[in-house]
UniProtKB/Swiss-Prot annotation:
Topological type in the membrane: Multi-pass membrane protein
InterPro entries per record: Cyt_b/b6_C, Cyt_b/b6_C_sf, Cyt_b/b6_N, Cytb/b6-like_sf, Cytochrome_b, Cytochrome_b_C_euk/bac, Cytochrome_b_N_euk/bac, Di-haem_cyt_TM
Transmembrane segment boundaries: 33-53, 77-98, 113-133, 178-198, 226-246, 288-308, 320-340, 347-367
Positions of heme b b566 binding: H97, H196
General remark: Heme 1 (or BL or b562) is low-potential and absorbs at about 562 nm, and heme 2 (or BH or b566) is high-potential and absorbs at about 566 nm.
Protein name in UniProt: Cytochrome b
Pfam families tied to this protein: Cytochrom_B_C, Cytochrome_B
GO biological process, one term: mitochondrial electron transport, ubiquinol to cytochrome c
Family recorded in the similarity comment: Belongs to the cytochrome b family.
PROSITE patterns listed in its UniProt record: CYTB_CTER (PS51003), CYTB_NTER (PS51002)
Domain of life: Eukaryota
Note describing how the cofactor binds: Binds 2 heme b groups non-covalently.
Length: 381
């Protein structure tokens, strides 16, 4: 069996990626999230496949087909709850994975980082089109509001929006194509994940200290397979607790009402994992400016490798940068809270301050802190 593992053309690739992979001996639980994201993706594809067997992408029957899945299909309620809450777990792991990358300087593996940002955007697109499918009130109005943002593009905006809608409003054509996108995008994500891993295994993983780990490597199996299984158990326990005890906690009550173009919900807001970007969008009183800020809030991640000024890779030995990183974390907890609040004072001003702080920390303050820490490293005698 050992020979087959090392000689068979297919099994050899798996062996080099998950079994005999040389891994740094000191990577912490923060390095668990890559494998957790892989498991999340598998769960989402499998539950999504079973939901697609019973779902109909027609405006007249979409809402009732979801109700039918929950009431009449064997364990349909469980599959749907796992799929809906699985998305929340996916994004939770994604945000922690990106945060780990920023804290420990993983972004200096530029190819891996850039593919990761593309993956983040693709997952966000998949989640957005997926949220439209149950055809509840928030599905319909969320689709209307977010697709309408494209009309802010000068000259071609209105044409572009109508092209995406497939008509003059969000209707049957929109729902059908969103279902098609929601079905195909996860497979594109799988392909991107393979490329992400390919680039990662070119360089190997970084580690908390930020120094070259080549002199001290251990095989991935059994050490990190066991460690990842612990993280997996914790994640699955959390997901099952959510799906079985409070499946609707993270959803919007408005989505229990069928979509009606004649009835606007009092507060249109996306799922919690988009609220940080939604808060930044709303904090700018100009439509085009808001759309650009929304895009910048995610695309700014592509600039992070270029803004690295420190002589050290990780934040482990950089107290000033650590303080700024945790300020950024606090800011990214404040923004979703603001995104879920009505547009009135004092939430407007808090959102604007939080948005300015978000961009300032990444573009100005953290690079300056890196330079200051470099200066403090120099001997003064």
């Amino acid at each position: 069996m050992t020979n087959l593992r090392k000689t068979h053309p297919l099994i050899k690739i798996i062996n080099h990626s998950f079994i005999d992979l040389p891994a740094p001996s000191n990577i912490s639980a923060w390095w668990n999230f890559g494998s957790l994201l892989g498991i999340c993706l598998i769960i989402q594809i499998l539950t999504g496949l079973f939901l697609a067997m019973h779902y109909t992408s027609d405006t007249l029957t979409a809402f009732s087909s979801v109700a039918h899945i929950c009431r009449d299909v064997n364990y349909g309620w469980l599959i749907r709850n796992l799929h809906a809450n699985g998305a929340s777990m996916f994004f939770m792991c994604l945000f922690l994975h990106v945060g780990r990358g920023i804290y420990y300087g993983s972004y200096l593996y530029k190819e891996t980082w850039n593919i990761g940002v593309i993956l983040l955007l693709t997952v966000m697109a998949t989640a957005f089109v997926g949220y439209v499918l149950p055809w509840g009130q928030m599905s319909f109005w969320g689709a209307t509001v977010i697709t309408n943002l494209l009309s802010a593009i000068p000259y071609i905006g209105t044409t572009l929006v109508e092209w995406i809608w497939g008509g003059f409003s969000v209707d049957k054509a929109t729902l059908t194509r969103f279902f098609a996108f929601h079905f195909i995008l996860p497979f594109i994500i799988v392909a991107l994940v393979v490329v992400h891993l390919l680039f990662l295994h070119e360089t190997g993983s970084s580690n908390p200290s930020g120094i070259n780990p080549d002199s001290d490597k251990i095989p991935f199996h059994p050490y990190y397979t066991i460690k990842d299984i612990l993280g997996l158990m914790i994640m699955l326990l959390t997901l099952l607790a959510l799906a079985l005890f409070s499946p609707d906690m993270l959803g919007d009550p408005d989505n229990f009402s069928p979509a009606s173009p004649l009835n606007t919900p009092p507060h249109i807001k996306p799922e919690w994992y988009f609220l940080f970007a939604y808060a930044i969008l709303r904090s700018i009183p100009n439509k085009l400016g808001g759309v650009l800020a929304l895009l910048a809030s995610i695309l700014i991640l592509l600039l992070i490798p270029l803004l690295h000024t420190s002589k050290q890779r990780s934040l482990m030995f950089r107290p000033i940068s650590q303080t700024l990183f945790w300020m950024l974390t606090a800011d990214l907890i404040t923004l979703p809270w603001i995104g879920g609040q009505p547009v009135e004072q004092p939430f407007i001003i808090i959102g604007q301050v939080a948005s300015i702080l978000y961009f300032s920390l990444i573009i100005i303050l953290m690079p300056l802190a890196g330079l200051l820490e470099n200066y403090m490293l120099k001997p003064k005698w």
